[in-house]
C-alpha cells in the first residue's frame, strides 16, 4: 500500500511506530534505520518512498540540520518529524525547513494513525495542543509575528473563521466538512478564500499564522 521509512535510534519506538503503520495501513512496506547516514542511503536506494518518519535527536541529525540535509538529498519524499520535543518554535522551524508534519512521541496511538493518514493524503499535520500554546516571548502576538493583522482577520466571514479554527486544530478538509456539516467542496472554497484574504501562499502558512488567535473573540462579532 505505502512505502514508509522510520528513522529513529530507539528500537522500542521504531517497533511501536511499525505496529501503528501495520495496523492502520495494512500491506505497507516499512523500513527502519537508526541514524541519518543510513536514512540518506536508503532514500537513494528507494526514491519511491511515500513518507519518512524522522526523529530529531538520532545520531547524525544535529537537530534541524539533519532535516535540511535530508530535504536537500531527497526533496521529493515527504518528511514528518516524530519527536519528544514539544517546543512550539521547534515545530514551526521544522515546517519552515520543509517537514510536512510534526508528531509528538507522546501522542496517543489513534492520533498518530490519524496524523499519518492525513499526511499520506497530502495534508499537513501539526499538533494542535502545541500550536495553540502561547510563545514564551511576550514581544508580539502570533498573528503579528506572522503578518496577520486584525484587519485581515476581520475580512473573514464567520464561516471562514470557523474553518480556519478547525485548520489550526489539525483537521483535514473532510473532518472540517463533517464537523461543520457542510460539503467538502465548500470547505475547499473557504480554504482558498482564507489563503487569499490572509495573503498567505499555502495551508501551512495559514495554520502557523493563526496559531495564537483568540477565535472566540472574533466569532463574537
Curated annotation (Swiss-Prot):
Sequence ranges assigned to domain Response regulatory in this UniProt record: 3-120
Keywords assigned: Activator, DNA-binding, Glycerol metabolism, Phosphoprotein, Transcription, Transcription regulation, Two-component regulatory system
HTH luxR-type domain location: 149-214
Gene3D superfamilies xrefs: 3.40.50.2300
DNA-binding region boundaries: 173-192
Disulfide bonding pattern of the chain: none
Superkingdom as given in the UniProt entry: Bacteria
InterPro entries: CheY-like_superfamily, RcsB_transcriptional_reg, Sig_transdc_resp-reg_C-effctor, Sig_transdc_resp-reg_receiver, Tscrpt_reg_LuxR_C
GO BP annotation list: glycerol metabolic process; phosphorelay signal transduction system; regulation of DNA-templated transcription
Protein name: Glycerol metabolism activator
Organism: Pseudomonas aeruginosa (strain ATCC 15692 / DSM 22644 / CIP 104116 / JCM 14847 / LMG 12228 / 1C / PRS 101 / PAO1)
